[in-house]
Amino acid sequence: MTRSPLRRLIFGALRRLLYLWVRSETINQSAMSLQLDRSRPVFYALPSPSLTDLAVLDHECTKAGLPRPVLPVAVGTLHEPAGFFYLTPDPDWLGRHDKRGAPPTLERVIAAVSQHAEEDAQIIPVSVFWGQTPASESSPWKLLFADSWAVTGRLRRLLTILILGRKTRVQFSAPIQVRDLVQHNKGHERTVRMAQRLMRVHFRNLKTAVIGPDISHRRNLVKGLVHAPLVRQAINEQAQRENIPVAKAEAQALRYGNEIASDYTYTAIRFLEVVLSWFWNKIYDGIKVNHIEQVQGIAPGHEVIYVPCHRSHIDYLLLSYLLFRNGLTPPHIAAGINLNMPVIGGLLRRGGAFFMRRTFKGNPLYTAVFNEYLHTLFTKGFPVEYFVEGGRSRTGRMLQPRTGMLAITLRSFLRSSRTPIVFVPVYIGYERVLEGRTYLGELRGASKKKESIFDIFKVIGALKQRFGQVYVNFGEPIRLAGFLDQQQPGWREQALGPQFRPAWLNETTTRLGETVARHLNEAAAVNPVNLVALALLSTSRLALDESALTRVLDLYLTLLRKVPYSQHTTLPEGDGQALIEHVRGMNLLAEQKDALGRILYLDEANAVLMTYYRNNVLHIFALPALLASFFHSSSRMSRDLLGQYVHALYPYLQAELFLRWAPEQLDEVIDQWLAALVEQGLLRRENDLYVRPAPSSRQFVLLTLLARTITQTLQRFYMATSLLLNSGQNTLSAEALEDLCVMMAQRLSILHGLNAPEFFDKTLFRHFIQTLVEQGVLRPDGNGKLGYHDKLGELAEGVAKRVLSAELRLSIRQVALHREHALEASIL
């Protein structure tokens, strides 16, 4: 290119053409202040081959009066056709780079200086940056094409020039004296390597300072995965199993690695920060963050695994955004392979997402690669984020933990526990979730839709709506080593090899998942929408007079302040009236005025949707609501009987709602809640008896509304036990009982107008039945048929007649007694 007058002529024409658009300047250090020795030859070192970078350098040298890089240079008897070289050599005719070779020009210059003591040469490292630094750029469009650590193709370089070329910056660094390198007397080859290493470190440090650190491990890690012993073993087994060459199995493992691995770039993080800052301000009234300081304290020296609840696709972006804004490293995020869509998938991958298939079953090679990838992240200290619920909660409840990722984490820690692992629960609460209407359709029976790139237009359409505030609460961290010490005290003394899979692993992983879920619920953010939904959905007509709703909300706020659920739970500011105004402003309340005042109600469109927001905080009200429900049919109860019934029901409530208290803590909490209910006038204490208010009183209405928040859960319990008792011992399997429960719930929801599709959620019945088995109330026989404890009927009726209306109990018993007819009716 520059070795003949013709090539120099072509290069000059190219430079002039380039500068019809490009504008460049020198940054940091003036080219005139380089303290060059003009009597000695000058060479320019560019990091990698780029004709446009060379043209910009030539332009800046001409402008500054420096020697031009495209002109010949002489060092003693050595005559070089041009005064520049690329630290990374030009590719060969097949496009391959020789990573080990040194630039020929550098080798010849060092040899010339070594052979002639009077000769010297100066090498000036030069970096060309297209556009502003990512930290300074505010345009998301320009950030997409900003300089990064990734290797770019010709098309992307052309787009970069077109979009960012008007702000091109050139950095001249202090010259390196070749004579100083030669005087170390290391020999020619070692001197060349030393010069290369010196410039590589220089270019890397400068690039880090200008565009941010290289936080991607993809380029090196993926190739390293296939050399890990467990992956090599899986490759060999795959080759034998499929009767294919080992090289083909290795190529398959590499494809899996590239499919999985994230490709973090600082520019992508900055792009997302700029876009999301605009997005949050456009769609939300603000983001409230609580307790992040404890994460800032434990992050140094720990492998941090963020385990947020999962309510929206925005969860992926929101947490990374907040961590980045608060000076913490954004995590590598586990995302379903369904999100690896064109355009969106690439952006998420550069923002830290790594993709995983929904199931690993039947693919041991993929399993080995994925496990090794996560193990590498953990042992190298990269923060990681995954959702223990697996998918997004469509009901607003905490879903039962899926323990796959926890099991991988636990086994990785047993392989190498040098870096302490700490789980950080993160509760993300929305006053209005973006996918709310989609969830509503799915709750009503619509099939789950596959994600599509066109879903982004739905988000754009949502920009016109008001979504309130977002609350992000960081919960109590869980130190994995301490958890294992508690669950398996002797784990440190066991032989922990790479293939170590102890007998206690599954049970311990399940307990870990439950602990994470409880810690997430402890960090719940109670917001105005939650409380309004809780109050109105407890009424028979989904409506209350405004003054009555204000009293209910004031009561709930007072109770939660008197008996806090946990130190990590947060409450909304303001009184009941302020909460109503806030929710009204979000168009979630309908109203009707008359001469007596204003009635607030939920219309049909919002009634089901509001069950989602009620369920967010149902666990917080479960215990006081249970206590209140015992006074539905009983005017007075003793403390001992209350405690007996609460202890009997608590294991099932705890399993469904992930309540935080251990059974031995229950009596103290019961007393705290009873004292709070007495203080607010909802109960009256007479010696060891607790007495409800008069049915005609306002306090009785408040007590009844509080009790109704847990009624549907208690109804499901009674349905399952009634079906079981009517069927008889060892008649139904767990699966058959589960199906019958769903059918009965669907029928009762129609008969009693329960407008809550999650009432007949199959997973809730499944988990209740599992808990009955774990508690020893149910006993599967050899054929999987369920037998039950002799006292089950007595206990179920004793509780039900106190917490459920006679009409509802009769309906449940009738449907249970004639379940064949119920089955026929449900099918028809």
Curated annotation (Swiss-Prot):
One of its GO terms (cellular component) is plasma membrane. Pfam families: Acyltransferase (PF01553), GPAT_C (PF19277). It is an enzyme of class 2 (transferase). It comes from the Bacteria. It is found in: Cell inner membrane. It catalyses: sn-glycerol 3-phosphate + an acyl-CoA = a 1-acyl-sn-glycero-3-phosphate + CoA. InterPro entries: GPAT/DHAPAT, GPAT/DHAPAT_C, GPAT/DHAPAT_LPLAT, GPAT_PlsB, Plipid/glycerol_acylTrfase. It is a peripheral membrane protein. SUPFAM superfamilies: Glycerol-3-phosphate (1)-acyltransferase (SSF69593). A motif (HXXXXD motif) lies at residues 309-314. Keywords: Acyltransferase, Cell inner membrane, Cell membrane, Lipid biosynthesis, Lipid metabolism, Membrane, Phospholipid biosynthesis, Phospholipid metabolism, Transferase. One of its GO terms (biological process) is fatty acid metabolic process. PANTHER family: DIHYDROXYACETONE PHOSPHATE ACYLTRANSFERASE, GLYCEROL-3-PHOSPHATE ACYLTRANSFERASE. This is Glycerol-3-phosphate acyltransferase. It comes from Pseudomonas putida (strain W619). The gene is plsB.
